[in-house]
Curated annotation (Swiss-Prot):
Cofactor(s) for this UniProt protein: Zn(2+)
Entry similarity comment: Belongs to the peptidase M4 family.
Propeptide: 25-200
Chief site of localization: secreted
Gene: mpl
Alphabetical list of InterPro entries matching this protein: FTP_domain (IPR011096), PepSY (IPR025711), Peptidase_M4 (IPR023612), Peptidase_M4/M1_CTD_sf (IPR027268), Peptidase_M4_C_domain (IPR001570), Peptidase_M4_domain (IPR013856), Zinc_Metalloprotease_M4 (IPR050728)
Protein name listed in UniProt: Zinc metalloproteinase
């Protein structure tokens, strides 16, 4: 099946490669736009040997995205479909060199032809009602910060069950912040999947921009703090980037619609009441600058999107999380944790979840979920590389909870550091969606090994390249190893690729 699939993919990639025109975008890369639709089977497909069976399967592949990077490599993202419906998160990526050679193929190469086993019998409205019932809510009793709480409601093919489902995304702020994906069988109304996707830790021209000073929770002087003045008030709104950065105060509510942009009568945000907001605002700008300057990424989505931070979430909440739209920070219980916005590594970690969402889109369960957590940790380190710890600054001195995670020594902080310690936990909230936080210690240790072999500067470049071009939504640890090897080879050659392999083999990923 794998060799057959590769034959098919090669044909699709080359057909696309020779029927696309190139158009440069704002960040120096090239997005390939499909200007023509092939009206007949290309000669390359007809010439394939019968053993490839390409003629039977070719029509089931759809090209989702094509990007040409600065090295001249063209990256194609393909998905299987059946009956015109795309599968959920099943992706294959094909990478073609400037001299038209396929250098790397990754993704689910074992997937065969999919046959739909059900028929559409329930309506979209019924499916939405069942989705809300499945999470113990109703559409009338939830509140969304932006627009309708029903963000997506498309029919896709669940590749595990081979059944069509309404894939419904629900994001709301009341009665609690949530970002649910619920899959409802189009025939029976059965719930085939439900998952809360929260990623946790455990402009008007007449307005003027100013620089300000502020003190964070650790009483550090954060500057420059970019603010905006409207009439007689200074607001924590940073307009110095293409993407707007805003910081809101929830005043211990959990509904983001209650959030107000933090303001002050002067540009000195030094009173303790502003400390959480100062940290959140300052570090959000630092993260923006990191991705822009180091990776040429304009904001978290690569398109200059806004970054909204909400502080004082709930009462003594020991957490921070990205909910798919914005980042929310709890104040901590003051016994074990300080306000969660005071740790630059945590801010970097949570905002990197957004970068992951807009790039590889790693599915938040099992090994792909552990990779999601790990890449957020690793980039948290890249953003604040003073030590190997994630979240140290948020911990109260003397607290037994200590540092949240260690890239260098995961096993010191209740994480696996080798595949022999890997745990296959249930894919439920109680099972931490397959142990994504526990098992992420394994790729974290592999990242530490890579950094010690290649250095931070090279490692952060190859990690970003792998995240942007080579990882797929369902990537496993072995896929990450191969993706990082290929990225290292692209940028630094065979020797660097071998060192990446050694780093992962040292944690039992062969």
């Amino acid at each position: 099946m794998k060799s057959k699939l590769i034959c098919i993919i090669m044909v699709i990639a080359f057909q696309a490669h020779f029927t696309m025109t190139v158009k440069a975008d704002s960040v120096g890369e090239e997005k390939l736009q499909n200007n023509t639709q092939a009206k007949k089977t290309p000669a390359d497909l007809k010439a394939l040997p019968d053993s490839c069976e390409a003629k039977d399967f070719y029509k089931n592949f759809k090209i989702l995205d094509m990007t040409k990077d600065k090295l001249g490599v063209t990256h194609y993202t393909l998905a299987l479909s059946s009956g015109g419906y795309l599968t959920d998160n099943d992706e294959i990526k094909v990478h073609v060199t400037p001299d038209n050679k396929i250098t790397f193929i990754n993704g689910d190469l074992q997937q065969g032809q999919l046959r739909i086993t059900n028929q559409i019998k329930i309506t979209e409205k019924n499916a939405i009602e069942k989705a809300f019932e499945a999470i113990g809510q109703s559409e009338a009793h939830v509140k969304s910060y932006v627009g309708n709480p029903v963000k997506e409601k498309e029919i896709i093919l669940n590749s595990r069950t081979k059944r069509l489902v309404y894939n419904i995304k629900l994001i709301f702020a009341e009665p609690e912040v949530a970002s649910w994906i619920v899959q409802v069988d189009v025939e029976t109304g059965a719930i085939l999947k439900k998952q809360n996707m929260l990623s946790e830790v455990e402009r008007a021209d007449t307005h003027k921009d100013f620089q300000a000073l502020g003190k964070g929770a650790n009483r550090l002087l954060q500057r420059p703090l970019h603010v905006m003045k409207i009439n007689d008030l200074f607001y924590l709104v940073d307009r110095t980037h293409k993407g707007l950065i805003r910081t809101f105060d929830l005043k211990h509510n959990t509904d983001t619609s209650f959030g107000k942009v933090v303001s002050n009568k002067t540009n000195m945000f030094t009173d303790p009441e502003f400390s959480s907001a100062v940290d959140a605002h300052f570090y959000a700008s630092e993260v923006y600058e990191y991705y822009k300057n180091v990776h040429q990424l304009e904001s978290l989505d690569g398109k200059g999107g806004e970054i909204d931070s909400f502080v004082h979430y709930g009462l003594n909440c020991n957490n921070a999380f990205w909910d798919g739209q914005e980042i929310l920070y709890g104040d901590g219980d003051k016994k074990n944790f300080k306000p969660f916005s005071c740790a630059k590594t945590i801010v970097g970690h949570e905002l990197t979840h957004a970068v992951i969402q807009y790039s590889a889109g790693l599915e938040y369960e099992g090994q792909s979920g552990a990779l999601n957590e790990s890449f957020a940790d690793v980039f948290g380190y890249f953003i604040a590389p003073n030590h190997w710890l994630i979240g140290e600054d948020v911990c109260v001195r003397g607290s037994r909870d200590g540092r949240i995670r260690s890239i260098k020594d995961p096993d010191k902080y209740n994480q696996a550091a080798h595949m022999k310690d890997y745990e296959s936990l249930p894919l439920t909230e109680e099972g931490d969606w397959g142990g994504v936080h526990y098992n992420s210690g394994i790729p974290n240790k592999a990242a530490y090994n890579t950094i010690t072999k290649l250095g931070k500067e090279k490692t952060e470049q190859l990690y970003f390249r792998a995240l942007k071009y080579y990882l797929t939504k369902k990537s496993q640890f072995t896929d990450a190893k191969k993706a990082l090897q290929q990225a290292a080879k692209d940028l630094y050659g065979e020797d660097a690729s071998k060192k990446v392999a050694e780093a992962w083999e040292a944690v039992g990923v062969n």
